[in-house]
Amino acid sequence: MDPNTVSSFQDILMRMSKMQLGSSSEDLNGMITQFESLKLYRDSLGKAVMRMGDLHSLQNRNGKWREQLGQKFEEIRWLIEEVRHKLKITENSFEQITFMQALQLLFEVEQEIRTFSFQLI
C-alpha cells in the first residue's frame, strides 16, 4: 500500500475521532468504523494482487468475493454521500478540511479497489 494512503487513513481517522458533532457522534463513529473496515479490505485486496496466483486462494477463502466486492463499493458510495452531507452541514473549518480530505481519500481508495479487482479478474 502506498505510504501516503496509509498516513492519510491514519490522519483522517485520528481527526474524525477528535470531532464532537453533538447528536451525530454515533453516526461519526459508524463512519470511522467503516473507514477502518474499508482500509483493511483494500489492504487485503492489494496483498492478494501482489501475490501471483492468489486469486485461487481468495476464491477458496471467500467463494463470493465478487459479491463482497460489490458490497464494498456500496459502502464506499454510502460513505461518500455521508461525508458530502457532513461537509454541507458543518461550519467548522477544521471539520470541513477533514471531510474534504476524507472525500478525496474515498475516491482514491475506490479507484485503487477497482484497479485491484480488475487485476484479479
Swiss-Prot record:
Motif annotated as Nuclear export signal, chain positions: 12-21, 85-94
UniProt cross-references to Pfam families, sorted A to Z: Flu_NS2 (PF00601)
Biological processes per GO annotation: exit of virus from host cell nucleus through nuclear pore
Compartments in which it is found: Virion; Host nucleus
Keywords in alphabetical order: Host nucleus, Host-virus interaction, Transport, Virion
Protein task: Mediates the nuclear export of encapsidated genomic RNAs (ribonucleoproteins, RNPs). Acts as an adapter between viral RNPs complexes and the nuclear export machinery of the cell. Possesses no intrinsic RNA-binding activity, but includes a C-terminal M1-binding domain. This domain is believed to allow recognition of RNPs bound to the protein M1.
Subunit structure: Interacts with protein M1. May interact with host nucleoporin RAB/HRB and exportin XPO1/CRM1.
UniProt similarity note: Belongs to the influenza viruses NEP family.
Note: Average number present in a viral particle is estimated to be 130-200 molecules.
Protein name: Nuclear export protein
Underlying gene: NS
